[in-house]
């Protein structure tokens, strides 16, 4: 799973336990951010 920091490093946001960089789900996040 991606951490919130890893997701943000990819210019993504954590929603619904998934990382969404540019609106593409690439992996689960560790928590709802």
Curated annotation (Swiss-Prot):
GO terms for cellular component: extracellular region. SUPFAM superfamilies: Defensin-like. The lineage of its organism: Eukaryota, Metazoa, Chordata, Craniata, Vertebrata. This is Helofensin-1. Expressed by the venom gland. GO terms for molecular function: toxin activity. GO terms for biological process: defense response. InterPro entries: Defensin_beta-like (IPR001855). The keyword Secreted applies. Lethal toxin which possesses an inhibitory effect on direct electrical stimulation of the isolated hemi-diaphragm. Neither hemorrhagic nor hemolytic activities are detected. Phospholipase A2 activity, proteolytic activity and arginine esterolytic activity are absent. Pfam families: Defensin_beta.
């Amino acid at each position: 799973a991606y951490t919130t920091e890893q997701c943000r490093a990819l210019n993504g946001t954590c929603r619904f336990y998934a990382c969404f960089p540019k609106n593409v789900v690439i992996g689960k996040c560790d928590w709802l951010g």
